[in-house]
Amino acid sequence: LSPDYETKIKINKRELLDCIDRATLLVKEGDKKPIIMNVTDENMELKINSFIGSMNENIDIAKEGKDIMIGFNPKFFIDALRVIDDEEVTLYMVNPKAPCFIRDEEEKYIYLILPVNFNAATN
């Protein structure tokens, strides 16, 4: 894993997983709506807008580095988080167009999740 990340986030895995799970309730099968993560100092705002409705939730985090707004397919994030046993996960992000890495301190696992382009004006 390259040490060139711009943003490092420590977050409670269960809180993040539950929040993304709730967001997927607003997305129909085949609908490719991304979940938008807006990361600021002590907060990650997760939002999704779909034809069914919209959601906007906040989760407390510990962040090092720059603020970032990035979009992901919620299903890919859920798939990775479900197989991690740790209570806390660490996310490493470079920019909104580069992959996000999820890994533990001992590097027993590394998950790579590709971001999704989104129009910030509509989300």
Label the model's feature ranges.
Residues 1:
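Active-site loop ensemble at the mouth of alpha/beta enzyme cores that anchors a bound cofactor
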Residues 4-123:
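DNA polymerase processivity clamps
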